[in-house]
Amino acid sequence: ELPHVLSQATVANGVATSGTITNWKGVVRNHYEGAKDDLKTIGWNNELKIGEWTTAADLTWSKATKLSSRYETTAGTVASQQDFLRYTNFDGANVTQVKYTPGLDYADRGVARLTDTMGWSGGAASPQAGYLGQPYIEDEVKAVRLTAKKAVEWGPIVDTTYGFNHTMRDKARSGQDGRLMIKGGGPFATADMPGSDVAQAGASGFNVASWDPRGSLGSIYELAPKVDADIYGKFWDVKERISTAYVMGGLDGNLFGLPYRGNVGVQAVHTDQTGGGYVVDKARCVGNTATTCPAQRVTDGDKFWDVLPSLNLSFDLGNEQFLRLGAAKVVSRANLDDLRAGQNFGLATQGLSILTGSGGNPQLKPFRAKSLDLSYEKYFGNKGYVSAAAFYKKLDTYIYRAPRAFDYAPFITSTTALPLTGPFAGSTQGLYTQPTNGNGGNLYGYELAANLPFSMISPYLDGFGVMVNHSDTKSGIELPEIGFANVNGDKVSIPLPGLSRKVTNLRLYYEKAGFQIAAAARKRSSFLGQVSDYQDNAQLTFIKGETVVDLQASYEIQSGWLKGTSLFVQAQNWNNAPFLEFVEDENNPTNRVDYGRTYHFGASYRF
């Protein structure tokens, strides 16, 4: 691959606003991503009255499997042939608005031929005209829940509930990855791209040849199975056993002249978690087969307790007004893929010479927090309500990814490359990046909500109404800014991933005589999110805020032999809002995905 050369450039304020790039290589990528999901579930629930006790037993089993397929195909000219690319209208930031013009016509199937265009997998010895990833996930849950409830007269405590839950969850990820090679040819063989479709190449402004690669394995391509350090990292299994014993008392009393109802209780939760995976020494991974890239199977885990008290009270202020108070210790469990064992490691190729690696953490603890919630609610008979709520969560522990000091001695072999220079010369000590628990953080904010039927204004508007809510949430956790040269660097503060600062929902509706018609909009501000990269690994990125509009209409037959039958139609993302990623400026997106509108039509019958 030759270095690019910019010529015929127009420069304004230090920015090359237009020019021609030579030694440029055009690669037409046509991808297909799909999945087949299967879900089975069985449940059994039974209640039994024994004297003054009401008992219940609930048994459930569920199993979900998902087989995904990700075809990546490349087309263009042979590896040795170069092209040029002209561009205009660049101002230094508007990447998605630049106009590009290539020298060759990549919509011409005589130019865009299926082949190994770049020799990405190592050249003639390991040709790659595409890639096929087929991850397989199996997730099984078994659970039992036993409860017993009895009425009592212990002051404000009017009933007691005792319970026990036990959940067993097993999740595993495996699959097959491999290089696609043109069938029956040499390393850089070419094949015609089927069909005649063309499509615009992202935001480039020019068209390229397009096709659907499904069904091409065996007819156009043959598969060479592949394993390497990254692929081994996707093979893992996790077992989680959670036992919960709890006691709860129902409350009904009077405090400072205000009647209240609620509950108080405590849970004792025991967790036993085990993760499995593979360790790969990159120095020994010299190829992409199990023989040339050996791996070592490892398992690890942890056991721990959480004690979680809680209190919920609802005060009756009179005139259909209520004040609600909630206080509790809560936990939120880690994603199971973060609990996997296994890692890959090797000598750092940049910066300080030191062993570095990455993987999961079977000893990871959940998010732990203390929460306090306060809300005021005003009802208008059975017609509507308004409410205002404030909430605060003190994060005791949270989960983030960061490097930590680690001794790789148990995994070192005679072929492992150790640092030759610097402070870590000859040392098995290094840095290991994994999900880990941090301490301290806050989440707080408020929420306003209202449901207002228009019949409160006029009986002529009976059936019409509006629902609206708005939340404003601030959050922050501190992460150590860790680099190879300064392990204990300054801390940086970031918001909790996945959480928008502001979220607003609006729903206009008509509900009467069996008709339900609604238009809804959800607006959220930009946030720090997670997306899957080209290797199916989750990566943090900023997501631009969006407004999504949904429409729905249904009718339930009110009489006759079809009474109880409902017909419905729904349109989701009716305004076709795009999914936009960005780095610093939300008005300069780095990636755009248009998921389009989704329509649902259906019928149901209620017995």
Where are these regions (language model features)?
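Short loop/turn motifs that connect adjacent beta-strands in outer-membrane beta-barrel proteins
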Residues: E47, G51-A56, G92-T96, A151-T160, ...
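C-terminal beta-signal and adjacent terminal beta-strands/loops
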Residues: G184, R522-S532, Y555-F607
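Gram-negative outer-membrane beta-barrel transporters
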Residues: Y392-K394, F411-V531
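Flexible glycine-rich, low-complexity coil/linker segments exposed to the extracellular/periplasmic environment
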Residues: V5-W24, F84-Q128, S174-K234, C293, ...
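Signature of Gram-negative outer-membrane beta-barrel scaffolds
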Residues: E1, L59, T65, A124-Y131, ...
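Surface-exposed extracellular loop regions of Gram-negative outer-membrane beta-barrel proteins
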Residues: D170-A172, S210-S219, Y232-F235, N319-S371, ...
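Transmembrane beta-strands of outer-membrane beta-barrel pores
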Residues: I50-E52, W61-L67, A75, Y136, ...
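Outer-membrane beta-barrel signature, preferentially recognizing the C-terminal barrel domain
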Residues: V28-L39, D230, K234-R241, D302, ...
